[in-house]
Amino acid sequence: MLRNFLKSRFLAPRGMSCFSQVMNPITGQNSWQERGDDYDYHLEVANAGFGDMLHDWERNQKYFAALRKTIAGMREAGREVHVLDIGTGTGILSMMALAAGADSVTACEAFLPMANCAEKILAANGAGDKVRLIRKRSTEIQVGEDMPRKANLLVAELLDTELIGEGAIGIYNHAHAELLTEDALCIPARARCYAQVAQSPLAAQWNSLKTIANLDGEPLLHPPEQLKSCQGEAALHDVQLSQLPSSAFRPLTDPVEIFQFDFQRKQEREKQRAQLLKLQSKQPGAAELVFYWWDIQLDDGGEILLSCAPYWAHPQLKELAAEKAKDHPLPNVVPWRDHWMQAIYYIPKPLQLLEAGKSFHLSCHHDEYSLWFDAREEAPTKSVRRHTCTCDLHMTYSRSRIGQLNQSPRNKRYLRYLEESIEAEKSNVLVLGNGCLLGLASSALGAASVLLHEPHRFSRRLLESIVKHNQLKNVHFLDKVEELEDSQLAALTHIFAEPYFLNAILPWDNFYFGTLLTKIKDKLPEGVKILPCSARIYALPVEFLDLHKIRAPVGSCEGFDLRLFDEMVERSAEQAVSLVEAQPLWEYPCRALSEPQEVLSVDFSNFGQEHSLKGSIELKHTGICNGVALWVDWKLVEDNSPRSIVSSGPSEPVVPGEFVKWDMFVRQGVHFPRKPKDAVTHLEWSTDFKPLLGELNFSFGQKKL
C-alpha cells in the first residue's frame, strides 16, 4: 500500500531523529528525510493489518463459538483446559478462551509493538493477570522456562490466502512436538483446499503478452518465442475473486478438494505433497488457470465451518443472499475479508479441451509455503516441478501492468494517434517510460528513428528481445535522457509516453514523465508533439461496502474493548501512512456519492508550474462518505474527443448512487477519512503541487451545509 521508503538509514540514539533515504517517484531522485527514530515502528504498526481481521465478524464469532464448544466438551470429559494462543495479536482469542472457561492461557506474540499493546488490552479487559504473555515466536518457546506446562488446546490464526504461506506447517509441527500434550485439540482443527479449473481471456491478460496490432487488426509487434514458451511464475495472484465478472470466465470443472491439512494430529504434517486428479470438463474451453480457496473446520466435529470460497461456490450462499440481497449485489453477500482472499494460479501451458466431458489431469503440488498447478491431457510420468519465469516479463512487471499492456481499448487510443501522426521515414520519436511497447510500435509504423529511454535492466532486456524478434532496425536504447545529443533532440518530432514507470505506486507518480521533459525542454524544437500533452486528477466521494474497514477503528469485538488498539494504530497512521494509498478498486465495490471533480490539471509543456487549488464537491446521493477515490486522466491531444483521453479511473460514466465500474488493470488512489460523518452534504478538498520538488499533497474535509 505504501511506497518502499526505506532503502538505507542513519541511526541515531533513542529519542533523537534519524535520516532515511527516500525515493521520490515524481522527481526520480533520492533524498534524505528526517524521521523520528521510531518511524519504522509506526510504519510497521500501521501496516500490520490486524484491524482487517478484527472487522471480520464471521471469523470472530466462529472462533469464539469453537472455543466455547471445545472447552465445554473438555470440561464434560473431566479435563483441565490449558490454552496456548500462538500469534495472539490484540489478545482477542486469549480473552475469548478465558471467557469460555479455560483454566490457564498462555499467549505468544513476536511483533513487539503488538505484544505491548496486547498487554495493555488484556489489563483493560480484566485479563492482565490471567494470561501469560510471551514476547517470542512460538518456535522459540521452551516449556518449563517460558510456559509452566504443555497446553492441551491450541488456538491460532496462522493462515493466509494460500493457507500455508505464513509457515503454518512448520509452526504446527513444532507446537505438537514441543508445546502440546499428546491429546491436544486445535482450533482450527483442519483445513481443506479447493481448486476450480477455468478459462478466462480477461484473467489470462494478467499473465501473458498478446500481439499488438494496428487499428485494422494487422500485427505490429509479435511476442518473441521466449515469451510464448515461458511458463510464467508459479506465485499466486491473490484477488477478491467474487468481483471477477461472471461473464469474464468459463468454469470448466466444479470445485474439487485437492488437499486436507489436519492441524490436530500429532504426526508431522508433510512439507511436500502432490495430488493428481483426473477430471472431466463441463464444457469446451482452454484450461488456462485455477481458482483456489480454502475452508477451515474450527471444531473437532467439523460443525463450525468458515469458508473463503467465492460467492458462486460458497456453502451458505442461499442463506446469506436471503439476508443481504436487498442492500448488496449477489457477489457481496458472502462475508468480506481482505486478509484471506482467493487466488488465481496460471497453468504453465493452457490445455485445450475441445468438448464437454473431455478427460484431463490436474496436478496439484505444495511445499512448506506455496502451491502450484499444471493441467495435462495425459498423467505426467514424473513430479511436476515448480515453474519460474524465463522471459523477464513476469519477474519485471506486476500482474496489473502485464494486463495493461494487453488492454486493447486502451492501446487503440494511443495507436490511433500514432497512426495518424507518424510519418514514414520522417518522424523521429523519443519514448519515455518502462516497458513502453506502444512507443516501440511507432517503429513498426514507419518512424525514421525511435529513441527508447529504458534504464531498467530486465525491462530493457525484454524490449531488446522484442526488437530483435520483430526485426526493428531503427530503435536505439538510452539509460538516461542526458545521453541525448543536441542534434538528436533538435531532430525530434514526437515525444511519447503512456506514461508508466516501475517506481510508480500511485497514478500520479507517473508525472515523472514531466520531470524527464524538463531536463530536455530547452533543447527541443518548436512544434515537437508531446503525448500525453496534459493530465488531470479527479476526486470522487464514495461509500465503500467494505474496503474502509482496513483503516476503520474497531472499538469493541465480541464484547471485548479494543480501543487501545485503535489508539495505537491511529497514532502510528498519523506518522507513517500516506494520506492517499493505492488500491485496485475493481476488487472493492463502492457507490458514487457525486460526480467526479477535477482537482488538478497539469500541462506537460509547462510542467514546472506550481499549483495550489481548493474546492468543494456537493454530495448528490445519501450515504456515508467513507472514502475518496482519485485517479489520473491522461489527455493525449488537445481536442474535445473522448477518444483522446486514457483514464486510470472508472471504465464507465459515473452515476451518483450507483456502483462504480473501475479499470481492472491499474490501481487508483484512495483517501480514507479518519472519522466519516453522517448527513454530510459537501466534501471540501485542497491540492498543493510543487512539481520540481515532487510534492503533491491533498487534504479533504467533510461538511454539512
Swiss-Prot record:
Gene3D superfamilies named among the record's database cross-references: Hnrnp arginine n-methyltransferase1, Vaccinia Virus protein VP39
SAM-dependent MTase PRMT-type domain ranges (all copies): 29-372, 381-705
UniProt-recorded Gene Ontology molecular function terms: histone methyltransferase activity; protein-arginine omega-N symmetric methyltransferase activity
The enzyme's E.C. designation: 2.1.1.-
Keyword Methyltransferase in annotation: yes
Keyword Disulfide bond: no
Enzyme class, UniProt record, top EC level: transferase
A Pfam family per the record: PrmA
Stored InterPro entries: Arg_MeTrfase, MeTrfase_PRMT7, PRMT_dom, SAM-dependent_MTases_sf
Keyword set, alphabetical order: Methyltransferase, Repeat, S-adenosyl-L-methionine, Transferase
Superkingdom to which the source organism belongs: Eukaryota
GO biological process: peptidyl-arginine methylation
Family affiliation: Belongs to the class I-like SAM-binding methyltransferase superfamily. Protein arginine N-methyltransferase family. PRMT7 subfamily.
Role, per record: Essential arginine methyltransferase that can both catalyze the formation of omega-N monomethylarginine (MMA) and symmetrical dimethylarginine (sDMA). Specifically mediates the symmetrical dimethylation of arginine residues in the small nuclear ribonucleoproteins SmD1 and SmD3.
Name recorded for this polypeptide: Protein arginine N-methyltransferase 7
Gene: Art7
